Amino acid sequence: MGHVPRNLPTLLMIGFEELRIISWNVRGAVHEYGKLFIKELIRSKKPDIVLLYEIRCQFAQVSHYWNSLGFFPAFVSEAIGFSGGIWVMIRTNFGLSTRLIHMHGQAITFELWKDNLSWVCNAIYASPIPEQREILWQHLTQLRESISIPWLLVGDMNEVLQPSEVRGGDFIPSRAHRFASVLDKCRLIDLGLVGGNYMWFRNRNNIIILSKRLDRALGDVDWRLAFPEASVEILTRVHSYHSPLLVHCGGQEHSTVLQRPFRFAWINWIGCVLLQ
């Protein structure tokens, strides 16, 4: 894993302000309902990058579909049967450069740059198996040592931080504490949410019996300083148990009375890790 050079000092990311990233655990990228919903998401939200997880197919099965949407597979970690899979899809006329830093079974790390400005993005699909998820936590902790430019992580963490992030099920303090310790070691904070509190739902007889906040966006101080107006929006849930997330790097065009983006007034690391 090579060292990622640093931009000094941390600057506002001019040229990245309009960047939009959709992140979604799609639970089957070949399903017709899922494909219709993705097409509508791209039409209405106009993302530049689409991160998909739990793919349940090979990219070759849907390559023509994505080409018709104007996206290409920048980085792909294929699913093994119905298990795993991460796709980083980028708009064809993106206008920014990308470089793969590291491919991991539960994470794809890549760099985006324009002119002399760059930052790192991680697409995360944490395993639902705690022992496998621990491998990811160790990987991210090691990765932190090689990254010295702004760092954003987006995806399905398959873990919660607080009791308030679970409704209808058990909160497991030991696992939440381990997740919080990883964020602390990696110097990451939660970027907050607009539009709700939960991203994953389990239904029984069309009644929601369990809700959790498994998906989130995390950034380090450098990333937040570079994107002070950035916000994270929960989108409508269709087809999957997970709601998509939309990261507005430059902030939403129209403010609402919903939660404002996190501001640094700042920073006790342990307190921030536990702050929603």
Show where each model-derived region lies.
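Short phosphate/oxyanion-binding micro-motifs
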Residues: 1-151, 161, 169-172, 185-186
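Conserved acidic residues
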Residues: 48, 156, 215
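Short helix-interrupting loop/turn segments at helix-coil junctions
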Residues: 61, 96-99, 150-155, 186-194, ...
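Short, P/G- and charge-enriched loop/turn segments at secondary-structure junctions
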Residues: 73-77, 96-98, 202-206, 232-235
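Active site of divalent-metal-dependent phosphoester/diester hydrolases
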Residues: 75-88, 186-217
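A short acidic, often aromatic-flanked loop/helix-cap motif at beta-alpha or helix-coil junctions
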Residues: 80-85, 130, 197-200, 238-240, ...
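Short acidic, glycine/proline-rich loop/turn micro-motifs
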Residues: 163-167, 259-260
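Surface polyanion/phosphate-binding segment centered on an Asp-His-Pro turn
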Residues: 210-212, 216-217, 221-276
